[in-house]
UniProtKB/Swiss-Prot annotation:
Protein known as: Protein RnfH
Species name: Pseudoalteromonas atlantica (strain T6c / ATCC BAA-1087)
Gene3D superfamilies: RnfH-like
Domain of life per record: Bacteria
Similarity section: Belongs to the UPF0125 (RnfH) family.
Gene for this chain: rnfH
Pfam families, alphabetized: Ub-RnfH
Region (Disordered): 86-108
């Protein structure tokens, strides 16, 4: 490795398996270029970079961002349920079970 190359990790997880791949790229490569260089797109055909969000160390970023040496690039899966809708359903269930006030929604 020359001083113009950087070490990165590319991570992707499914409920039943995950991958953490190491890749060496030239300094100045973008997140998208690093993901493609890692080969992870060939291992997981469900990844669509035009739709998937990505991040570096658990902070979302753009595909055009430039990572630093030692960064972990993460590819995020879309949410299965809308968080607001899921919370509303839990609150309704709590009201029905008597664990929440039917008017205010607070604890009974």
């Amino acid at each position: 490795m020359t001083d113009k190359q950087i070490n990165l990790e590319v991570a992707y997880a499914l409920p039943d398996r995950q991958a953490l791949l190491e890749v060496v790229v030239e300094m100045g490569h973008t997140v998208e270029e690093a993901i493609k260089a890692s080969g992870i797109l060939q291992r997981f055909d469900d990844i669509d970079l035009s739709k998937s969000k990505v991040g570096i160390w658990n902070r979302t970023c753009k595909l055009s961002d430039v990572p630093q040496d030692g960064d972990r690039i993460e590819i995020y899966r879309p949410l299965i349920a809308d968080p607001k809708e899921a919370r509303r359903r839990r609150a309704e269930k709590a009201k029905e079970e008597g664990r929440a006030n039917k008017v205010t929604g607070g604890r009974a």
